[in-house]
Amino acid sequence: SKEPVSVVLPDAEHPAFPGRTRRPGNARAGSQVTGSREVGQMPAPLSRKIGQKKQQLAQSEQQQTPKEKLSSTPGLLRSIYFSSPEDRPARLGPEYFDQPAVTLARAFLGQVLVRRLADGTELRGRIVETEAYLGPEDEAAHSRGGRQTPRNRGMFMKPGTLYVYLIYGMYFCLNVSSQGAGACVLLRALEPLEGLETMRQLRNSLRKSTVGRSLKDRELCNGPSKLCQALARSKSFDQRDLAQDEAVWLEHGPLESSSPAVVAAAAGIGHAGEWTQKPLRFYVQGSPWVSVVDRVAEQMYQPQQTACSDXALIVQK
Protein backbone atom coordinates (compact mmCIF):
# COMPACT_ATOMS: atom_id res chain seq x y z
CA SER A 1 0.00 0.00 0.00
CA LYS A 2 1.07 3.58 -0.60
CA GLU A 3 2.40 5.70 2.23
CA PRO A 4 -0.03 8.47 3.29
CA VAL A 5 0.98 11.88 2.02
CA SER A 6 1.43 14.55 4.67
CA VAL A 7 0.88 18.20 3.76
CA VAL A 8 1.18 21.47 5.64
CA LEU A 9 -1.86 23.73 5.63
CA PRO A 10 -0.98 27.40 4.96
CA ASP A 11 -2.74 30.20 6.78
CA ALA A 12 -5.29 31.99 4.58
CA GLU A 13 -6.10 35.66 5.05
CA HIS A 14 -9.46 36.27 6.71
CA PRO A 15 -11.75 38.29 4.39
CA ALA A 16 -13.30 40.30 7.23
CA PHE A 17 -10.06 41.06 9.05
CA PRO A 18 -7.16 42.16 6.82
CA GLY A 19 -3.91 41.05 8.36
CA ARG A 20 -5.52 38.18 10.29
CA THR A 21 -5.43 34.59 9.17
CA ARG A 22 -8.19 32.07 8.76
CA ARG A 23 -7.29 28.42 8.99
CA PRO A 24 -8.96 25.83 6.76
CA GLY A 25 -11.54 23.74 8.57
CA ASN A 26 -10.69 22.98 12.18
CA ALA A 27 -7.03 22.12 11.56
CA ARG A 28 -4.29 23.94 13.40
CA ALA A 29 -1.92 26.14 11.41
CA GLY A 30 1.15 24.20 10.33
CA SER A 31 -0.30 20.83 11.43
CA GLN A 32 0.23 17.70 9.37
CA VAL A 33 -2.82 16.34 7.62
CA THR A 34 -3.29 12.97 5.96
CA GLY A 35 -6.34 13.00 3.72
CA SER A 36 -8.89 14.97 5.78
CA ARG A 37 -7.67 13.99 9.23
CA GLU A 38 -4.93 15.34 11.46
CA VAL A 39 -2.02 13.06 12.29
CA GLY A 40 -1.52 12.13 15.93
CA GLN A 41 -3.86 11.51 18.84
CA MET A 42 -4.14 13.18 22.21
CA PRO A 43 -2.34 11.27 25.02
CA ALA A 44 -4.78 9.35 27.24
CA PRO A 45 -3.83 11.11 30.54
CA LEU A 46 -4.29 14.53 28.94
CA SER A 47 -7.60 13.48 27.39
CA ARG A 48 -8.92 12.32 30.78
CA LYS A 49 -7.78 15.55 32.43
CA ILE A 50 -9.55 17.69 29.82
CA GLY A 51 -12.72 15.61 30.19
CA GLN A 52 -12.71 16.11 33.96
CA LYS A 53 -12.22 19.86 33.50
CA LYS A 54 -15.16 20.09 31.09
CA GLN A 55 -17.37 18.23 33.58
CA GLN A 56 -16.38 20.62 36.37
CA LEU A 57 -17.16 23.65 34.21
CA ALA A 58 -20.55 22.22 33.22
CA GLN A 59 -21.48 21.62 36.87
CA SER A 60 -20.34 25.12 37.79
CA GLU A 61 -22.46 26.70 35.04
CA GLN A 62 -25.56 24.84 36.21
CA GLN A 63 -25.19 26.37 39.66
CA GLN A 64 -24.63 29.94 38.44
CA THR A 65 -27.38 32.54 38.19
CA PRO A 66 -27.78 34.41 34.88
CA LYS A 67 -26.03 37.44 36.39
CA GLU A 68 -23.08 35.33 37.52
CA LYS A 69 -22.79 33.75 34.07
CA LEU A 70 -22.56 37.16 32.41
CA SER A 71 -19.97 38.49 34.86
CA SER A 72 -17.81 35.38 34.59
CA THR A 73 -17.71 35.49 30.78
CA PRO A 74 -14.26 36.70 29.67
CA GLY A 75 -14.32 39.82 27.51
CA LEU A 76 -17.32 41.72 26.13
CA LEU A 77 -19.05 39.03 24.06
CA ARG A 78 -22.31 40.93 23.69
CA SER A 79 -23.67 44.36 24.40
CA ILE A 80 -24.26 45.23 28.04
CA TYR A 81 -27.37 47.13 26.93
CA PHE A 82 -29.28 44.18 25.43
CA SER A 83 -30.22 40.95 27.22
CA SER A 84 -31.11 39.21 23.96
CA PRO A 85 -31.27 39.93 20.20
CA GLU A 86 -35.05 40.31 20.51
CA ASP A 87 -34.54 43.29 22.85
CA ARG A 88 -32.69 45.27 20.22
CA PRO A 89 -34.69 48.16 18.77
CA ALA A 90 -35.72 48.24 15.14
CA ARG A 91 -33.53 50.07 12.64
CA LEU A 92 -34.36 53.68 11.82
CA GLY A 93 -36.32 54.15 8.60
CA PRO A 94 -35.88 56.60 5.71
CA GLU A 95 -38.20 59.21 7.22
CA TYR A 96 -35.82 59.62 10.17
CA PHE A 97 -33.04 60.98 7.96
CA ASP A 98 -35.27 63.49 6.15
CA GLN A 99 -34.33 66.38 8.46
CA PRO A 100 -32.16 69.50 8.07
CA ALA A 101 -28.47 68.83 8.69
CA VAL A 102 -28.30 70.63 12.04
CA THR A 103 -31.41 68.92 13.36
CA LEU A 104 -30.20 65.53 12.18
CA ALA A 105 -26.72 66.06 13.64
CA ARG A 106 -28.24 66.64 17.07
CA ALA A 107 -30.75 63.82 16.67
CA PHE A 108 -27.93 61.36 15.88
CA LEU A 109 -26.45 61.78 19.36
CA GLY A 110 -27.34 58.70 21.39
CA GLN A 111 -28.39 56.56 18.41
CA VAL A 112 -26.56 53.29 17.73
CA LEU A 113 -24.59 52.63 14.55
CA VAL A 114 -24.46 48.94 13.61
CA ARG A 115 -22.02 47.16 11.30
CA ARG A 116 -22.54 43.52 10.30
CA LEU A 117 -19.37 41.80 9.05
CA ALA A 118 -19.24 39.09 6.40
CA ASP A 119 -19.10 36.35 9.04
CA GLY A 120 -22.26 37.65 10.76
CA THR A 121 -20.49 39.44 13.62
CA GLU A 122 -22.28 42.65 14.59
CA LEU A 123 -20.43 45.69 15.91
CA ARG A 124 -22.30 48.48 17.70
CA GLY A 125 -21.41 51.97 18.82
CA ARG A 126 -23.39 54.83 20.31
CA ILE A 127 -22.96 58.12 18.46
CA VAL A 128 -21.50 60.77 20.78
CA GLU A 129 -20.17 63.39 18.33
CA THR A 130 -21.36 64.74 14.97
CA GLU A 131 -20.74 67.67 12.64
CA ALA A 132 -23.24 69.30 10.27
CA TYR A 133 -22.45 70.53 6.74
CA LEU A 134 -25.16 72.72 5.28
CA GLY A 135 -24.65 72.41 1.54
CA PRO A 136 -23.76 74.95 -1.18
CA GLU A 137 -23.59 77.96 1.17
CA ASP A 138 -21.26 76.13 3.58
CA GLU A 139 -17.64 77.04 2.69
CA ALA A 140 -16.38 74.06 4.70
CA ALA A 141 -18.51 71.53 2.80
CA HIS A 142 -17.37 69.48 -0.18
CA SER A 143 -20.54 70.70 -1.90
CA ARG A 144 -19.76 74.42 -1.46
CA GLY A 145 -21.03 76.54 -4.31
CA GLY A 146 -23.26 73.69 -5.44
CA ARG A 147 -20.29 71.77 -6.79
CA GLN A 148 -21.15 68.18 -7.75
CA THR A 149 -18.52 65.59 -8.64
CA PRO A 150 -18.43 61.79 -8.79
CA ARG A 151 -16.68 61.91 -5.42
CA ASN A 152 -19.38 63.85 -3.53
CA ARG A 153 -22.42 62.46 -5.34
CA GLY A 154 -23.68 60.87 -2.11
CA MET A 155 -24.21 64.35 -0.62
CA PHE A 156 -26.86 65.06 -3.28
CA MET A 157 -28.69 61.74 -3.00
CA LYS A 158 -31.74 61.06 -0.84
CA PRO A 159 -31.48 61.59 2.94
CA GLY A 160 -29.85 58.62 4.66
CA THR A 161 -27.33 57.98 1.87
CA LEU A 162 -23.77 57.34 3.01
CA TYR A 163 -21.03 59.63 1.74
CA VAL A 164 -17.59 58.08 2.33
CA TYR A 165 -14.44 59.88 1.27
CA LEU A 166 -10.69 59.40 1.61
CA ILE A 167 -8.40 61.88 3.40
CA TYR A 168 -4.60 62.02 3.42
CA GLY A 169 -4.66 59.15 0.94
CA MET A 170 -5.23 56.54 3.65
CA TYR A 171 -8.12 57.38 6.01
CA PHE A 172 -11.88 57.28 5.46
CA CYS A 173 -14.63 59.50 6.88
CA LEU A 174 -18.31 58.53 7.10
CA ASN A 175 -21.13 61.02 6.42
CA VAL A 176 -24.90 60.69 6.12
CA SER A 177 -26.85 62.87 3.68
CA SER A 178 -29.65 64.95 5.16
CA GLN A 179 -32.49 67.13 3.94
CA GLY A 180 -31.25 69.68 1.42
CA ALA A 181 -29.08 69.19 -1.66
CA GLY A 182 -25.42 68.82 -0.75
CA ALA A 183 -26.04 68.76 3.01
CA CYS A 184 -24.84 65.97 5.28
CA VAL A 185 -23.73 64.99 8.79
CA LEU A 186 -20.24 63.71 9.59
CA LEU A 187 -20.07 61.00 12.26
CA ARG A 188 -17.08 61.97 14.41
CA ALA A 189 -17.06 59.60 17.39
CA LEU A 190 -18.75 56.54 18.86
CA GLU A 191 -18.97 54.94 22.28
CA PRO A 192 -18.22 51.25 21.58
CA LEU A 193 -21.02 49.02 22.86
CA GLU A 194 -20.59 45.60 21.27
CA GLY A 195 -17.71 43.79 19.59
CA LEU A 196 -14.89 45.75 21.22
CA GLU A 197 -12.26 43.06 20.71
CA THR A 198 -13.10 42.79 17.01
CA MET A 199 -12.89 46.59 16.74
CA ARG A 200 -9.49 46.47 18.41
CA GLN A 201 -8.27 43.81 15.97
CA LEU A 202 -9.51 45.82 12.99
CA ARG A 203 -7.80 48.97 14.28
CA ASN A 204 -4.55 47.12 15.00
CA SER A 205 -4.49 45.60 11.51
CA LEU A 206 -4.26 49.12 10.05
CA ARG A 207 -1.80 50.63 12.52
CA LYS A 208 1.76 51.30 11.42
CA SER A 209 3.07 49.23 14.30
CA THR A 210 1.16 46.74 16.43
CA VAL A 211 4.08 46.43 18.84
CA GLY A 212 3.58 48.20 22.16
CA ARG A 213 0.56 49.00 24.28
CA SER A 214 -2.91 47.87 23.29
CA LEU A 215 -5.53 50.41 22.28
CA LYS A 216 -7.77 51.48 25.16
CA ASP A 217 -11.53 51.24 24.75
CA ARG A 218 -11.89 55.02 24.55
CA GLU A 219 -9.37 55.11 21.70
CA LEU A 220 -11.23 52.71 19.44
CA CYS A 221 -13.75 55.12 17.88
CA ASN A 222 -12.85 58.62 19.15
CA GLY A 223 -12.40 60.18 15.73
CA PRO A 224 -13.96 60.07 12.23
CA SER A 225 -11.29 57.84 10.70
CA LYS A 226 -10.87 55.71 13.80
CA LEU A 227 -14.53 54.70 13.82
CA CYS A 228 -14.29 53.78 10.13
CA GLN A 229 -11.33 51.52 10.87
CA ALA A 230 -13.02 49.97 13.92
CA LEU A 231 -16.16 49.17 11.91
CA ALA A 232 -14.34 48.06 8.74
CA ARG A 233 -15.73 50.94 6.67
CA SER A 234 -14.17 51.74 3.32
CA LYS A 235 -15.01 53.52 0.08
CA SER A 236 -17.17 50.52 -0.85
CA PHE A 237 -19.82 51.90 1.52
CA ASP A 238 -20.14 55.15 -0.42
CA GLN A 239 -23.69 55.87 -1.66
CA ARG A 240 -25.25 53.02 0.29
CA ASP A 241 -28.69 53.52 1.84
CA LEU A 242 -28.44 53.53 5.64
CA ALA A 243 -32.16 52.76 5.87
CA GLN A 244 -32.00 49.64 3.68
CA ASP A 245 -28.45 48.23 3.67
CA GLU A 246 -27.86 44.79 5.21
CA ALA A 247 -24.30 45.51 6.39
CA VAL A 248 -24.79 48.89 8.07
CA TRP A 249 -27.74 50.60 9.72
CA LEU A 250 -28.85 52.82 12.60
CA GLU A 251 -30.91 51.83 15.66
CA HIS A 252 -32.58 53.84 18.41
CA GLY A 253 -30.23 54.25 21.34
CA PRO A 254 -30.99 51.95 24.30
CA LEU A 255 -30.41 54.65 26.88
CA GLU A 256 -31.50 58.26 27.13
CA SER A 257 -28.52 60.53 27.72
CA SER A 258 -28.78 62.71 30.81
CA SER A 259 -25.92 64.89 29.58
CA PRO A 260 -26.69 67.95 27.42
CA ALA A 261 -25.32 68.32 23.92
CA VAL A 262 -22.39 70.71 23.58
CA VAL A 263 -22.48 73.01 20.54
CA ALA A 264 -18.99 73.87 19.30
CA ALA A 265 -17.03 74.94 16.23
CA ALA A 266 -16.12 72.32 13.67
CA ALA A 267 -12.82 70.54 14.31
CA GLY A 268 -9.89 70.28 11.90
CA ILE A 269 -11.13 72.80 9.30
CA GLY A 270 -8.54 75.31 8.16
CA HIS A 271 -9.41 77.41 5.10
CA ALA A 272 -13.16 78.08 5.17
CA GLY A 273 -13.31 81.67 6.42
CA GLU A 274 -15.95 82.36 9.03
CA TRP A 275 -17.28 78.82 8.61
CA THR A 276 -14.35 77.48 10.61
CA GLN A 277 -15.97 79.07 13.67
CA LYS A 278 -19.59 78.20 13.00
CA PRO A 279 -21.07 76.16 15.88
CA LEU A 280 -21.97 73.12 13.80
CA ARG A 281 -20.33 70.37 15.87
CA PHE A 282 -22.32 68.57 18.53
CA TYR A 283 -21.18 66.17 21.22
CA VAL A 284 -22.34 64.59 24.45
CA GLN A 285 -20.90 66.54 27.35
CA GLY A 286 -18.69 64.49 29.65
CA SER A 287 -18.33 61.60 27.21
CA PRO A 288 -14.77 60.18 27.27
CA TRP A 289 -15.22 58.99 23.68
CA VAL A 290 -15.45 62.47 22.12
CA SER A 291 -12.58 63.30 19.74
CA VAL A 292 -12.11 66.99 20.62
CA VAL A 293 -13.41 68.67 23.78
CA ASP A 294 -14.13 72.42 23.67
CA ARG A 295 -14.17 73.78 27.23
CA VAL A 296 -15.00 77.32 26.11
CA ALA A 297 -18.04 76.12 24.18
CA GLU A 298 -19.18 74.04 27.15
CA GLN A 299 -19.18 77.13 29.37
CA MET A 300 -20.76 79.34 26.71
CA TYR A 301 -23.71 77.16 25.75
CA GLN A 302 -24.55 75.40 29.03
CA PRO A 303 -27.22 75.46 30.21
CA GLN A 304 -28.72 78.30 28.17
CA GLN A 305 -28.25 76.43 24.88
CA THR A 306 -31.58 74.67 25.31
CA ALA A 307 -33.33 78.00 24.86
CA CYS A 308 -31.55 78.70 21.56
CA SER A 309 -32.82 77.57 18.21
CA ASP A 310 -30.59 75.76 15.75
CA UNK A 311 -30.89 78.67 13.32
CA ALA A 312 -29.73 81.16 15.95
CA LEU A 313 -26.68 79.05 16.69
CA ILE A 314 -25.77 78.82 13.01
CA VAL A 315 -25.81 82.54 12.27
CA GLN A 316 -23.91 83.41 15.43
CA LYS A 317 -20.29 84.37 14.66
From Swiss-Prot:
- Protein's name according to its UniProt entry: DNA-3-methyladenine glycosylase
> GO CC terms for this protein?
mitochondrial nucleoid; nucleus
Q: Does the keyword Aminoacyl-tRNA synthetase apply?
A: no
Recorded name of the encoding gene: Mpg
Kindly indicate whether the keyword Hydrolase belongs to this entry. Answer: yes
Q: Which family is annotated? A: Belongs to the DNA glycosylase MPG family.
Assembly notes? Binds MBD1. Binds SSBP1.
NCBIfam families linked to this entry: 3mg
Which lineage is the organism of this entry classified under, starting from the top rank?
Eukaryota, Metazoa, Chordata, Craniata, Vertebrata
